[in-house]
A protein has these predicted regions:
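Short glycine-enriched nucleophile-adjacent loop
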Residues: 181-190
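Alpha/beta hydrolase fold serine-hydrolase catalytic domain that processes acyl esters and thioesters
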Residues: 1-113, 118-122, 126-141, 145, ...
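Gly/Ala-rich beta-loop-alpha elbow adjacent to hydrolase catalytic centers
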Residues: 172-177, 181
Length: 378
């Protein structure tokens, strides 16, 4: 079995001229974008740093130890991967610019982006959901908001990048980043659509059924390349594109979402024949349930679910992991205050998530415990 590090060991000495940019490179850059680049990668599109320069400056930051520990849900070897890129021939001279990092609890907004110049050609990578509860809530807000803040941020970012660079673009993103790149390609002007060469979606949450019927979507559909692990959970939230690859992962259950667990052979992924039964059941059950709700009901569900989570006082998954007992007690108290109808609805959705996430995601651990052990009648 082989991962990103093996890929760089095999292909790291080969330039992009010798081996063109491919799907593995797209996922690798999408994953590296989880790195805490604040104050290291230039915000301007005109000022650029190579991977080698970024790695050097990254190690000099005052909060270096905090930067390499980027939360419970992001692979702890992410910084190591960035350093590996800085050392190898293939990535050493790739330039980074246009860094953005926007976070607002008030607006329920979490967005970050980096533009990589690969042989001078721009690859826009949009960060996925991070460790914050705000980031997760924004994902679920896709259910009822026409455009979540991160989708608006992504479209604006692409317009700025398109004004700064000539020629074609590659858009790539993992998790929520996958949703953002597809949405950006659909919502931008026809002129900008023509400048998009490829769109890479790696296990991103989907869209409503109507989204795929738009003329604007059909204009870029053949440029979209979607990939999901066999045990996909995030990618099964809402409806996904009809064309996709299923990737073999060494991760267990939900942790197959971790891009570093995806298995690589040469410049390609090792594929699986189908999704797991658990993933297929979750996709069917969750989307049949959410499709039956009107917009107001969806909004109410998200606010209720995250109202319980926010009652813990935690800001991140890591916070909940550290204070699991306190968090659980506060969430149970918040749940107990709900009326009977809302409790019943919460138990229904918790059962769906319990079947696919078990104890994997800290923000859901207390809720799963609540589902298993509460002596509150639904």
């Amino acid at each position: 079995m082989a991962d990103f590090f093996d890929y760089l060991n095999w292909r790291g000495d080969l330039s992009f001229e010798k081996v063109p940019f491919n799907k593995i490179d797209a996922l690798l850059l999408a994953h590296v974008t989880y790195s805490i680049f604040d104050g290291v990668v230039p915000e301007s599109f005109s000022k650029k740093k190579t991977f080698a320069q970024v790695a050097r400056d990254f190690t000099k930051t005052a909060d270096y130890e905090e930067r390499i520990n980027i939360g419970f849900l992001i692979n702890k070897r992410t910084a190591e991967l960035m350093f590996k890129c800085a050392e190898c021939e293939r990535y050493r001279n790739v330039q980074l610019c246009g860094f953005r990092n926007i976070y607002s609890e008030e607006k329920t907004e979490q967005f970050a982006a980096v533009t990589y110049l690969v042989d001078g050609k721009p690859v826009i990578a949009l960060r996925g959901t991070d460790d914050t509860i705000t980031g997760w809530k924004e994902d679920f807000n896709i259910a009822w908001q026409d455009q979540i803040p991160a989708q608006k941020d992504a479209l604006l970012y692409f317009k700025e990048a398109a004004a700064a660079f000539k020629g074609s673009f590659v858009l790539t993103g993992h998790s929520k980043g996958g949703n953002l790149v597809i949405n950006t390609a659909v919502k931008c002007s026809k002129t900008l659509q023509k400048r998009i060469k490829e769109i890479y979606n790696f296990d991103g949450p989907g869209f409503s059924r109507d989204f795929f019927e738009q003329e604007a979507y059909k204009n870029v559909e053949n440029k979209i390349f979607s990939f999901y692990p066999a045990f996909s959970v995030v990618g099964m939230i809402f409806h996904h594109p009809k064309n996709f690859e299923i990737v073999k992962s060494e991760g267990f259950a939900f942790w197959q979402h971790d891009a570093m667990s995806w298995q690589i052979m040469g410049a390609d992924f090792i594929n699986e024949a189908s999704f797991t039964d658990e993933s297929k059941l979750f996709y069917k059950a969750f989307n049949e349930w959410i499709d039956k709700l009107d917009n107001s009901q969806r909004h109410n569900f998200v606010d209720t679910l995250f109202g319980i989570l926010e009652a813990s006082g935690a800001k991140t998954n890591s916070d909940i992991e550290k204070e699991a007992v306190k968090s659980t007690a506060k969430m149970i108290a918040a749940y107990a205050e709900l009326d009977k109808a809302r409790r019943k609805e919460m138990l229904k959705i918790l059962k769906l998530f319990k079947n696919v996430i078990a104890d994997d995601i800290p923000i859901f651990k207390p809720l799963v415990l609540l589902k298993n052990n509460l002596r509150i009648n639904g």
